[in-house]
């Protein structure tokens, strides 16, 4: 499945909630009909079956983290193999992706922008260039912007946007050096309550 390149607003309208795909703070203007699905008949959002609700939740989380379907299923399989709660394991695996960590640290205004920074070799992990967005960041890893990339206006703008977001307690960032430490994996209580990971577990358990 190819990565979606269309309007970001359409994805948020599809899920009926702001996925923050255009901005790290508030992606959608109040004039936009977020409660209406895209399309001519979007205002008549149909009642979903149990399966439909589970599928929508999976699609919502997949789109928030910018992960393709096959990748997402592989994350679920890995989460199911790990000890503990499968749903929480899944969210931790997604949170540990390098592109997500770069976004959480404020170096990218969105996860898509953070993914681009990683792909363009603008990011270091423990002093070495890593250009794989799905790279798994471990506890105490140091993630930094490469010296020659620090002058990029989009990174400076992203850091300003990040100042308006709630700062993750599991990450420590020095905005002056553009360097951060991934102190630990986030607990479930650290993450958005708008995600119901149990619905995803139920979907894949069928």
UniProtKB/Swiss-Prot annotation:
GO terms for cellular component: small ribosomal subunit. It comes from the Bacteria. GO terms for biological process: ribosomal small subunit biogenesis; translation. PANTHER family: 30S 40S RIBOSOMAL PROTEIN, SMALL RIBOSOMAL SUBUNIT PROTEIN US4M. Keywords: Ribonucleoprotein, Ribosomal protein, RNA-binding, rRNA-binding. This is Small ribosomal subunit protein uS4. SUPFAM superfamilies: Alpha-L RNA-binding motif. InterPro entries: Ribosomal_uS4, Ribosomal_uS4_bac-type, Ribosomal_uS4_CS, Ribosomal_uS4_N, S4_RNA-bd, S4_RNA-bd_sf. One of its GO terms (molecular function) is structural constituent of ribosome.
